[in-house]
Amino acid sequence: MIGAGTVGGGVYEIIMNRLGGSSSTNSSSNNTTPIITKICVRDASKTRDFTLDSTSTQIVTDVQSILNDDDIDIVVEVAGGVTFAKDAVYASLKSGKSVVTANKALIAENLDEVIALVNEVNATNPTKSVKFGYEASVCGGIPIIHTLQSGYNGDIINEVQGICNGTTNYMLGKMEEGVDYDDVLKEAQDLGFAEADPTADVEGHDVRAKIAILAKLAFGTSVSVESIPCMGITNISVIDFAYAKSMGCTIKLIGTAVRQSKYGEHDGALSVYVSPKLVPNDHLLASATGAGNVVAINSANLGVASYTGPGAGRYPTANSIVADIMRVANDTCPTIPFPLSSNIEINNDYVSAFYIRISFQDGLGIVRSVGELAERSGVSIHSILQQPITDRMAADTVVTTESCALSQVKALCDLIEKEEYALAAPVFMPMIADY
C-alpha cells in the first residue's frame, strides 16, 4: 500500500482486523485472504491513527521496495496528488502488479492511458494479467463504478446525474434552513467537511472530475475535465431557496452527463456539466441529505434507478477499495471497463429549462425590458416570480425559461447585467422540469 492517511488506515484496519489478514487472525469468509505486507510512506517515524501489526506489515519509505517485491500482487495507491501517484501506478502496472486506487484526479485525466497500459502489459505477459480498480474514486461509499461496469451491459444509458460531493450537499441543506453561505461554510470547516481552502468543493471542481469518470463509464467517451462547464455554489443565496420552495423544489449541486434530445443538428450529442440545479422535492435526487451522495441513472431498460450512500469518509471509501482488492484477488474484475461507443458527439452547450434570479433597483418597465432581452437572446420565458418587495433599492425577481441552450441564457444574463436597473450579474442555474 502506498500512503497511510485516513483512507489508508481504514483499508489496513478492514483487511488486517476484519478480513483476517494479520498473522494473528485468519477468519476471512472470502476465497482469498489479502495481507498488507508493506506500506510506503514519506515519514516512517510519523504516528499513525491505526495499530500496525509489525509481524505482518513493514513500513518503508522507498516505493521501489514494493515494486521490486515479487511476492506483492496488488498495489493500493492512497497517497493522493497526481504526479507521484501517476508515476507509482504506472510503475506498478509495468512491474506486473495489479493496482487499486481512490485517486479521482488521476482517473479523470488519465483513464484512457491507464487502460491502454493495462492492455499493453497484459499483451506482453498474458499468463499473469494485471487488473485496475478505481471504485473508490467516485462516491466512496456507493459501488457506482462497478454498477456501471457490469450492471448495464445490455442497456443503453441516456443520462447520469449525481450529487457527488458531500460537503456542498451539507452546505446547501443548511442554506435551505436559512443559514447564510459564509456561516455555513465556516460550520462545514469546523466540522471537518470542508477544507481550509474549500475551492475544489464549492466551485464544483471535485464533482467535475467525478462526472468525467462517470461519463466515460456510461457513454464510452472521454471528456476533458477542463472542457466541462462548471458552476459551483458560491453565488447561491438563501433567497434562491425561498424561490425554490415556492416552486416545490430544492437546490442541489449536480454533475450531469446526458444525451441531448430536441437539439436540432446536435440531437443525440453528449453534454457533460456541473451546476447547482433546481430539483423538484419528489425527485430521486432531492433525497440526498447531509453529506450523503445520490447517483440517478436513466436507461432504456430500467428507466430511472438511483444509488444512494455515503460519499466519503474513512470506512466508506476504504470499503470500496477493499471490494476492488477482493475482485482483483478473485479474478472477478470486469474485462471491458466501459462501452466502446467513442464516436458520440460532445456538445457542452447543454439544453435545459433555466432559473434566472435578477437583482435590480425597482422601477417602471423592468419586466418588459427583460422580456425584450430574452427575445433578442432566443430565450422563451416560462414564468416570472417575485417575492414581496421590501426594499425598492434592492429587489429580486426570478424568470424561469423554456428549454434553451446554455449559451442563450448566458447571452441573456450578459444583456441584463448591462442595464441600469441591474445591481449585479443575474444568478442562473438549470432546472429539472417536466415542460
PLM segments and residue spans:
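Rossmann-like NAD(P)H-binding beta-loop-alpha module
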Residues: I72, N122, T127, G133-D206, ...
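N-terminal Rossmann-fold NAD(P) dinucleotide-binding loop
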Residues: G8-G9
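Substrate-binding/catalytic subdomain of NAD(P)-dependent oxidoreductase enzymes
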Residues: K174-M175, D183-S287, G292-V294
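NAD(P)-binding Rossmann-fold cofactor-contacting core
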Residues: N17-L52
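Rossmann-fold NAD(P)-binding glycine/threonine-rich loop
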Residues: A79, F84-S95, K104-Q149
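Rossmann-like NAD(P)-binding element
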Residues: T57-Q58, V63-V89, K97-A102
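A conserved regulatory-domain signal marking ACT and ACT-like small-molecule sensing domains
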Residues: S320, I325-Y435
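Catalytic, metal-anchored helix/loop core of enzyme active sites in primary metabolism
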Residues: Q58, E159-Q161, N169-L172, E187, ...
